[in-house]
Amino acid sequence: MIEPTATEPEPSRGAEPPGPAATAAASGRAPRAALSLSLPLPGSRRATVVGAGSFGTALAVVLARGGLRTTLQARTAEQAAQLEAERENRRYLPGVELPAQLRVESVAAGVARADYVFLAVPSQRLDEAIARLGEGGLGRRTAIVSAAKGLVPPHGSAPSGVLGAAFGAHRVACLGGPAHAQEMVHAGAGLVAASRDQTLAETLANVFTRAGVVCERSDDPIGVELAGAAKNAAALAAGATEAQGLNAAGAAAGHIFAEVWRYAQSVGARPESMIGLAGAGDLVATALARESRNRRAGELLAAGVPAGEIPERIGQAVEALQSVPLLALTLERAGGQAAITGALGRLISGELPLQEWVALVRTTVPPPPRWRRRPSRRALTWATVRRLLGGGRGSAQAER
């Protein structure tokens, strides 16, 4: 379960002992100068992208075009050798030539010289990636950027929280927003770079801007990550329901977004993260994309294909198939409403027939809002007078 964000998570419990900057960051009182001691230096130009799937490859291409000395790390030496020889990822990103300045190697090579490490791996494999980072000579100034859009098992933790616990929250950022791989390398994307550290978020935004990719900055990594998890689940739900009508598909996606948002509020996420690029923007892009893995996975579920066979049918991992049951469990543990998200998890596991899923989507009514009684005009007038009087006294005391 994700912890509320009122305070910083504990500093590094990984390979490095927490230094002064990490300790100060955990207290919430660190000056920017102290934090910057553990961030990449100005002019840092080396990036490593871990994960050579469609998005990881596209990300590496964009970073290399933006002037960073970029290395793409494949999972196996055989895959790395094939990419290096063909200078194209024909399986996951066909038709996109790898820039000459982009190096390819296996994850066994480590990340000792990287200023930025981008983790383009599913949230279910994040623990494995963290272990490799610890073994790979991660530098003290290296920033770690997660591109996962799901929660980390077994407790449903946000990726940034898990990375922050291992390496220090001020060194961690995440990416969100609509960024389909093929389109990103040809026409750009709408990214969000989120971090607790303002300098890191600004630096990442500038890196992508130089590469021709629009990138917003955010100080709400948990909100951005939950928005991405909600998007994946909503896209899967819409795909599973679309054959029953667009209204049903819209209802399924809307219910899931609302359930995740109520939980996100309880852990301190900001509304802008859910309604902006990271949430609504990403959902619209995914819903419109016929090639979306999560949407296609939903369509295959509706066609009766078992969830275990879907990744092979699609040819890539589908993060939502594994993240939705964990997302539902996380919402339920927190005492939140998760009727539709939980039902989607049971549809994935085969416990809930499709027609029962559709019927539940069509008949579920979300909890009513808390109606607020409008104050009378007289009450408003007196409230205004009291506020003005109180404000005057407060201002006078502040000046003293």
Language-model segments: which ranges?
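NAD(P)+-binding Rossmann beta1-loop-alpha1 motif at the extreme N-terminus of oxidoreductases
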Residues: 2-3, 7, 13, 28-96, ...
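Electropositive phosphate-/nucleotide-binding environments in soluble metabolic enzymes
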Residues: 53, 57, 77, 104-108, ...
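Rossmann-like NAD(P)(H) cofactor-binding subdomain of soluble oxidoreductases
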Residues: 98, 104, 109-188, 204-205
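Internal alpha-helical scaffold of NAD(P)-dependent oxidoreductase catalytic cores
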Residues: 125, 136, 162-171, 188-273
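General beta-strand structural signal in soluble alpha/beta enzymes
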Residues: 146, 171-176, 215-219, 275-276, ...
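NAD(P)-dependent Rossmann-like dehydrogenase/reductase catalytic/cofactor-binding core
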Residues: 231, 235-239, 265-279, 283-400
